[in-house]
Regions:
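Active-site-adjacent loops and short helices of periplasmic peptidoglycan-processing enzymes
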Residues: 7-164, 173-174
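Extracytoplasmic
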Residues: 165-185
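Gram-positive cell-envelope targeting signals
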Residues: 1-6
């Protein structure tokens, strides 16, 4: 055979240094795909998770929706709350009929508060009941320093997490095919 010789495969691990990185953020955590820590800065310090909350909102919703293509109507009464909190929207309008799938895309990709509030309303009957599901899921995942008070990430003293807990959540959520498809779109 005239095939060129092949190089032997190597499984040599390389050491990576992050000493040169200056992170402006108060907290940070970088892990590899398996969750092994590569870099951290105050990863256990409490933060307001803001729109990262929507990761939990989306994964809890996905786990409670049986038909992603079912149509639901956006309630009209949610827009006052969004305006009061200066929340972002995905651009849907009151009483518009859309699928659960569209609501999930709007929540994750556009950080749409109307999508999060609509999902919570249809799945649990109220935002508060949905938040209970979120906090139960956080405990189940071992997110030991996380507390949610709303589905959108609106700032509240009792709404907090850590970089470490958010990392746990994201690794879990990315294992779900639907979440992965939406998140990586």
């Amino acid at each position: 055979t005239d095939a060129p010789p092949t190089e032997p495969e190597t499984t040599e691990e390389r050491e990576i240094s992050f000493d040169f990185i200056e992170i402006e953020s108060e907290t940070a955590l970088l892990t590899d795909i398996d969750g092994n820590e590569l870099y951290s800065k105050n990863q256990y310090s409490r933060i307001y998770p803001a729109s990262l909350t929507k990761i939990m909102t989306a994964i809890v919703a996905i786990e409670h929706i049986s038909d992603l293509d079912e149509q639901i109507m956006i309630p009209g009464d949610i827009y006052d709350q969004i305006a009061y909190e200066n929340g972002s929207t995905a651009g849907f309008v009151a009483y518009e009929c859309v699928t659960y799938r569209d609501m999930l895309y709007g929540a994750v990709l556009s950080s749409g508060a109307e999508c999060c509030l609509t999902l919570a309303s249809y799945i649990s009957g109220s935002e508060w009941e949905f938040v209970e599901l979120m906090n139960s899921k956080a405990k189940e995942l071992g997110m030991s320093d996380t507390s949610f008070t709303n589905v959108c990430g609106f700032q509240n003293y009792e709404h907090y997490s850590t970089a470490s807990d958010i990392s746990l959540l994201l690794r879990y959520a990315l294992e779900n095919d639907t979440f992965y498809e939406i998140f990586t779109s």
